[in-house]
């Protein structure tokens, strides 16, 4: 449409509005009210669309976050499982080594290298074996291995304790039955040296005194 046509249309519209304003003053206001309502409807429609868009974006962000958490959780779970399997394999290997060491010890074929490995395994796992409840199918075998380990660590301690007990027993016997040559008078057994028995005769006293004079 040309600019002249637009101007003509605009003039016609203004003339109609002026006429309606003079005849029906409320007509123009109604027209404006309808325009406002349309604007409000358009604004509400736009706001609703924006709200939907924001919600969609938020849901997508939440989905991405949940996916990240799920992936991270699965990764942690997988690493724990791998670590647990590695620990289990190491324990089984140590048990197998202990069985070999046990056999060699019985046969007196335990090498120096095996002895060092045995001591290392014992020092590493002794406390853990003491405090742990074993629930595997090889319970009996593991108990046997545990007993072997405990025996290896307690042999030297038992020897020292036995030696100490023997020493204390000997000291107690010596204290209870002291040497008669050093603590008793041969003439009067059971008396403390230097004390005469009750009822000693005067003759014995005088004879002892005479002997003493003759000695001088």
UniProtKB/Swiss-Prot annotation:
Keywords: Nucleus, Transcription, Transcription regulation
Compositionally biased tracts (Acidic residues): 201-216
Biased composition (Low complexity): 35-48
Composition skew (Basic residues), residue ranges: 161-170
A Pfam family this chain is assigned to: RRT14
Cellular localization per UniProt: Nucleus, Nucleolus
Single GO cellular component term: nucleolus
Residue spans of biased composition, Basic and acidic residues class: 171-188
First-listed, main subcellular location of the protein, grouped into a coarse class: nucleus
Region (Disordered): 26-51, 153-216
Highest taxon above the source species: Eukaryota
Family affiliation: Belongs to the RRT14 family.
Biological role: Involved in ribosome biogenesis, probably through modulation of rDNA transcription.
Protein name, per record: Regulator of rDNA transcription 14
